[in-house]
Structures are given as structure tokens and as C-alpha cells.
Regions:
Chain B
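Amphipathic alpha-helical dimerization/coiled-coil segments
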Residues: 77-106
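N-terminal helix-turn-helix DNA-binding core of bacterial DNA-binding proteins
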Residues: 1-37
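Short, hydrophobic-biased segments on the C-terminal half of alpha helices
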Residues: 42-46
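Basic, amphipathic "hinge/linker" alpha-helix immediately C-terminal to the N-terminal HTH DNA-binding motif
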Residues: 60-83
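Beta-hairpin "wing" of winged helix-turn-helix
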Residues: 48-62
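Short alpha-helix boundary/capping motifs
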Residues: 55-57, 73, 97
Length: 199, 106
């Protein structure tokens, strides 16, 4: 298949990412086991056409990220200060949004838009609670960030100056947090080279 | 061992040929489970000594060794027992009243 090596490398990258979250003593074995299945999926003659095999392989690799949190022995590693600060910022923003939107409803109970915003901000708090209970939520975070940006931009377009303040609150820290997240995920981290060598 | 749907499907897949070594991908297809569900489940079954695992020796040079799983003797016994009990429970459970077919009475 064209681009097979690249696909395999991408799959391995996802599996490696998943294994980074496992304890050191079982990390290497899991990486070897999971990465060894990638070529088998990519060459499975029972699955046709070839692009569908590639999709299946990538889904397999991506789902190991979810699996590591359920694997016995998995422990949440020590959290960085940036991650703690990011969470704190989200909590403050969520609570401020709930308070402000509830206040807005109390001020203008007849406007349907005012009901939409408190519901949305409660969802924001629900997401943060879920993230605390279940740590696998990067994709949800990205989806939520996208919807947040859309909603804030839509609100800012309405011309209310208070919405510009909220837009600034979200627009300024979010690119920084996203960049930090990307750096953490994409850049070499402790244990990664050992995994690459062993794979 | 708590008999959930995924556990039942994995045990059924193993019991279709208890002596055969099963790879992760092979089990994924047989049990129709994603990797994120299957591997943690296999790890738990292995901890409970119901499943054993070993690394295969690659047949060709450059091939990666794959890890395969097999039910232990105790695993076969417990799997058969648990699956039989699950099947009996399903038969005992009262059937849900379905929606009446169009045109029928009731």
C-alpha cells in the first residue's frame, strides 16, 4: 500500500503515546505487543478495500489511548504546574460563566438566548467534573474548545462589550494552553526513546 | 469475575477453540471489541490466572514477534461455567413485552 511506512509510523506514534501513560515496568512490553499488531491489521486480507484497513489500524492505535486508563497498574503520573494552572483557569472561567449567565437570565427571563448560555456553561462545568473522574478527555477538550470559540465569537458579534471581555478571557489563554498541550504530546518525553529503541 | 458483555464475548471467542493461541487483533475481530476495551480486559483475565500469554517466535526475518493468549485449564473450566450460568440467567429472565405487531390485538 502507498504510504504504508508513514501510516505504520503514525500508528506507532499513537501507541507510543498511549504507553507513556503506563508504569515503566509494563510500558515496553505493552508497546511491543500493541505495535506488533499494526502490520497485521494493515495487511489483513479479510478487510477490503485497503484504505479501510488503514482506517482500522489507526482506530486500533488511537483506541489504545483509551485502553491504558483501564489497564490494571495504570497510575496517573505527577501533574505539571502548567496542567494544574490550566485546570484552575478552566474552573474559574466555568464558574464565572455559570454565575454571569444565571444573572443574565434573572435580568431578562424572556430572552431565549439567555437560557442557552447558562445551559452551555453548566455543560462546561460538567465536562470539568468528568475530566476529574475519568482522565481520558483530550479529544473532548478539543471539541469543547472548538464549540467554546464558536459561541464566544458569535456572542462577540452581537456587540455587547461584556462579551468582548469574555472573548478575551478565552482567546488569550486558549492558544497558549493548546500550544502547551501540543508540546507535551508531540515533543520527546521521558521514556519515549527507550520505547522507540525497543520497538 | 464479573460477567459483563465484553467478558462474555471474549470468553466465547476463546472457547470456540480453547487450545488455539489467539492474538489481540484476532480476538478483537472474534469478540467485536475495540482495542481499548479488549486489552485491559485481557490484562485483568491474566491477573486472575484465567488466561496465559506468551510471545511467538517470528516465522520470517524482520517480522515482529506477536503476543498470543490462551485460556488456562482453570480458565476453560471457569469460562464454561460462567457462560452456562449467564445463558441460564437469560433464559430465566422474563421476556420483555414487545411492541404489538401492526394489525394485531393487544
Amino acid at each position: 500500500m502507498r504510504g504504508e511506512r508513514r501510516l505504520l509510523r503514525l500508528g506507532e506514534c499513537l501507541v507510543r503515546q498511549a504507553c507513556r501513560r503506563l508504569p515503566q515496568e509494563i510500558r515496553e512490553e505493552h508497546y511491543r505487543e500493541w505495535a506488533a499488531e499494526l502490520p497485521a491489521i494493515l495487511h489483513d486480507p479479510q478487510v477490503r478495500p485497503a484504505p479501510w484497513r488503514a482506517v482500522r489500524m489507526l482506530v486500533y492505535a488511537a483506541d489504545t489511548l483509551r485502553g491504558t486508563a483501564l489497564t490494571p497498574g495504570w497510575v496517573r503520573g505527577p501533574r505539571s504546574r502548567l496542567s494544574v494552572a490550566g485546570d484552575l483557569l478552566f474552573w474559574v472561567a466555568a464558574l464565572v460563566l455559570v454565575a454571569f449567565n444565571s444573572w443574565s437570565v434573572a435580568q431578562a427571563p424572556g430572552d431565549w438566548q439567555e437560557y442557552l448560555l447558562p445551559a452551555w456553561s453548566v455543560l462546561f462545568v460538567a465536562y470539568l467534573i468528568r475530566k476529574r473522574v475519568h482522565p481520558v478527555g483530550r479529544m473532548t477538550a478539543l471539541l469543547y474548545t472548538g464549540s467554546t470559540l464558536t459561541l464566544v465569537a458569535w456572542n462577540a458579534a452581537q456587540g455587547n462589550w461584556l462579551n468582548y471581555v469574555f472573548a478575551a478571557l478565552v482567546f488569550i489563554p486558549l492558544p497558549i494552553l493548546l500550544l502547551a498541550w501540543w508540546l507535551r504530546v508531540a515533543m520527546p518525553a521521558r521514556g519515549r526513546h527507550a520505547l522507540r529503541d525497543s520497538g | 469475575m464479573r460477567m459483563t458483555g465484553p467478558v462474555e464475548r471474549v470468553l466465547t471467542a476463546f472457547l470456540s477453540d480453547p487450545a488455539a493461541p489467539r492474538y489481540g487483533y484476532d480476538l478483537m475481530k472474534a469478540a467485536r471489541l475495540p482495542s481499548g476495551t479488549l486489552y485491559p480486559l485481557l490484562a485483568r483475565l491474566e491477573q486472575q490466572k484465567l488466561v496465559g500469554s506468551a510471545w511467538e517466535t517470528p516465522q520470517q526475518e524482520g517480522e515482529r514477534p506477536r503476543k498470543y493468549y490462551r485460556l488456562t485449564g482453570e480458565g476453560v473450566r471457569i469460562a464454561r461455567l460462567e457462560l452456562a450460568q449467564a445463558s441460564a440467567r437469560r433464559q430465566r429472565a422474563p421476556a420483555r413485552p414487545g411492541r404489538p405487531a401492526p394489525g394485531s390485538l393487544g
